[in-house]
Swiss-Prot record:
PANTHER family: CHLOROPLAST 50S RIBOSOMAL PROTEIN L22-RELATED (PTHR13501), LARGE RIBOSOMAL SUBUNIT PROTEIN UL22M (PTHR13501:SF8). The keyword RNA-binding applies. Belongs to the universal ribosomal protein uL22 family. Keywords: Ribonucleoprotein, Ribosomal protein, RNA-binding, rRNA-binding. One of its GO terms (cellular component) is cytosolic large ribosomal subunit. GO terms for biological process: translation. Pfam families: Ribosomal_L22. It comes from the Bacteria. Part of the 50S ribosomal subunit. InterPro entries: Ribosomal_uL22, Ribosomal_uL22_bac/chlpt-type, Ribosomal_uL22_bac/org-type, Ribosomal_uL22_CS, Ribosomal_uL22_sf. This is Large ribosomal subunit protein uL22.
Amino acid sequence: METIAKHRYARTSAQKARLVADLIRGKKVAAALEILTYTNKKAAALVKKVLESAIANAEHNDGADIDDLKVAKIFVDEGPSMKRVMPRAKGRADRILKRTSHITVVVSDR
């Protein structure tokens, strides 16, 4: 049984979050949680919360056994960017893009 959890509009770029997602793809959830706990990146904390949510969803909604679960799929898509202005010298301005991403984790017992 596949169970999904999503974090939409996560305040990190998809490029940075994909680095973390690649670490746990296909792993058992216990191993994935351990990897994320000791990964020193902001995106690791965001991905860990989504993974914990997916585990809780599987346990509560589907009655799955946590020991059998693995990360079947994990992907990070780009969300909308917030446009901001940074003043520069001589009256000019640069546009800053504050990027967001959509993190999706699918856990499965097979």
